[in-house]
Amino acid sequence: MKQTRTAARQSRHQRIRRKVKGTSDRPRLAVFRSHQHIYAQVIDDTRHHTLVAASSLEPELRQKLGKGSTCAASIAVGRLIAERAKAAGIERVVFDRGGNIYHGRVKALADAAREGGLDF
């Protein structure tokens, strides 16, 4: 029986998570992409604690962008997560694409986070 798209993404994400772990020295930058929005979190997996978060749902971004499902929204979220991470003293992260293909909105967020100063 064929898996649904969501189930296939979740199984890919579990496979990735077995290898990608965030530490306090190098936390994990986790990306979740829904149909309408994109979310990013910097997570310390040893303490199970979210250090920094940003999404296209935030009021300041929603006013500027309108739709949260575009590459422009992903770029804005990537810049915002990098800015917040730098303010929290985080410079190096491990990228977790969340089972999504590294293309389009996920790639745009990653590139913007790199341009913002995060190293991964």
Swiss-Prot record:
Q: Which UniProt keywords apply?
A: Ribonucleoprotein, Ribosomal protein, RNA-binding, rRNA-binding
GO molecular function per UniProt: 5S rRNA binding; structural constituent of ribosome
Region: Disordered; residue ranges are 1-25
Its cellular-component GO annotations read: cytosolic large ribosomal subunit
Which InterPro entries does this one have? Answer: Ribosomal_uL18_bac-type, Ribosomal_uL18_bac/euk
Pfam families membership: Ribosomal_L18p
HAMAP family linked to this entry: Ribosomal_uL18_B
Q: Which family does it belong to?
A: Belongs to the universal ribosomal protein uL18 family.
Q: What is this protein called?
A: Large ribosomal subunit protein uL18
Organism per entry: Thermosynechococcus vestitus (strain NIES-2133 / IAM M-273 / BP-1)
Q: What gene makes this protein?
A: rplR
